[in-house]
């Protein structure tokens, strides 16, 4: 599915700025029950030479709709794919799992230079 993501040139590659993306339109299937899992996802990155084209990101998310996957695997798949496509200076992804059975779960991963200068 990585090939669904489109990278476009960063028009300001010499500048440190952050891009923050948030959506509630991410679903996948529980690998055990087959029931849908609903997610909110927050992506924060400091671009280098490329940025992600947002329509391609939306279609990429839709591609998970019928995939059986754990929360942890989903987070790491999205993280690796985005990292491979745009090679950001910094990347953080938080995956908020819709509450099920009274349990609230958030999984996250981050790599790269800190955002201290751009916060």
Named regions from a protein language model:
Residues 1-119:
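N-terminal intrinsically disordered, cationic/polar leader segments
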């Amino acid at each position: 599915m990585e090939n669904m993501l489109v990278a476009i040139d960063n028009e300001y590659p010499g500048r440190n700025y952050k891009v923050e993306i948030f959506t509630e339109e991410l679903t996948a299937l529980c690998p055990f029950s087959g029931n849908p899992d609903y997610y909110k996802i927050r992506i924060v990155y400091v671009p280098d030479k490329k940025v992600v084209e947002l329509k391609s990101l939306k279609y990429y998310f839709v591609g998970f709709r019928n995939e059986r996957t754990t929360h942890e695997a989903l987070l790491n798949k999205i993280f690796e794919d985005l990292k491979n496509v745009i090679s950001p200076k910094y990347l953080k992804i938080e995956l908020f799992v819709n509450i099920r059975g009274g349990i609230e779960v958030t999984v996250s991963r981050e790599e790269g230079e800190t955002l201290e200068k751009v916060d």
